[in-house]
Amino acid sequence: MPGRHVSRVRALYKRVLQLHRVLPPDLKSLGDQYVKDEFRRHKTVGSDEAQRFLQEWEVYATALLQQANENRQNSTGKACFGTFLPEEKLNDFRDEQIGQLQELMQEATKPNRQFSISESMKPKF
């Protein structure tokens, strides 16, 4: 059983990093670092929390794949990633998670981004 769990975690980790390749460079960098930190942070959690963690990352990977496919079919050439987070979902977050979410939002919306991204750049998948 533990071997299967490790394989599942590794496969999901690689899948998420691979999906990040369709993101603009600054968001890819931010997302990759966040994924690495989160997977490292959850390495020693209990079985129940590990299952919830994997389920949420699988939902994220599925949503990102869907958005990447929609962006690829979009004729305007402008990629759009992300989703609305309803208040009910926010109420389920712990204080630590709210803090992480705020940090991510601040990083993702910084006006002085590290890279210059062309609007016409369409990610390849």
From Swiss-Prot:
Pfam families: Complex1_LYR_2. Its main location: mitochondrion. Keywords: Chaperone, Mitochondrion, Transit peptide. CDD domains: Complex1_LYR_SDHAF3_LYRM10. GO terms for biological process: mitochondrial respiratory chain complex II assembly; regulation of gluconeogenesis; succinate metabolic process. InterPro entries: SDHAF3/Sdh7. Residues 1-30 form a transit peptide. It is found in: Mitochondrion matrix. GO terms for cellular component: mitochondrial intermembrane space; mitochondrial matrix; mitochondrion. Interacts with SDHB within an SDHA-SDHB subcomplex. Belongs to the complex I LYR family. SDHAF3 subfamily. This is Succinate dehydrogenase assembly factor 3, mitochondrial. It comes from Homo sapiens (Human). The gene is SDHAF3.
